[in-house]
């Protein structure tokens, strides 16, 4: 797990692994989540439908982006423009899992936002 996310401490990697897998009947292990729904919407929504949904969100919205994430910055790639009242906060030293990579900084951002 640390190979995939070098920001994780050994303790975090162990915790996520222990709580993120199920043991199969044959003794092997499988992730609890379904990799097939990670890339696409589980509801079969098109990109246009997703953008229309974002456009209906009227409450203040905080998009937190780890600067070392594999995902694009929502401001740079245009996703931000679909929201009525959103802002992007970029976090140094964090990948896609900002809440794992920089927990205290993430919590501070969240508290300030709320």
Predicted segments — roles?
Residues 2, 6, 68-69, 96:
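Short beta->alpha junction loops/turns
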Residues 91-107:
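Catalytic histidine-centered segment of alpha/beta-hydrolase-like enzymes
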Residues 109-113:
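C-terminal alpha-helix
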């Amino acid at each position: 797990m640390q190979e995939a996310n070098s920001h994780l401490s050994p303790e975090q990697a162990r915790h996520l692994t222990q709580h993120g897998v199920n043991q199969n009947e044959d003794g092997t292990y499988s992730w609890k989540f379904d990799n097939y729904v990670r890339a696409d919407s589980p509801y079969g929504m098109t990109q246009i439908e997703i953008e229309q949904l974002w456009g209906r969100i009227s409450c203040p919205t905080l998009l937190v982006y780890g600067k070392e994430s594999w995902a694009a910055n929502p401001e740079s790639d245009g996703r931000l423009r679909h929201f009525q009242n959103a802002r992007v906060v970029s976090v140094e030293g964090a990948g896609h899992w900002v809440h794992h990579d920089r927990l205290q900084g993430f919590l501070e951002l969240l508290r300030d936002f709320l």
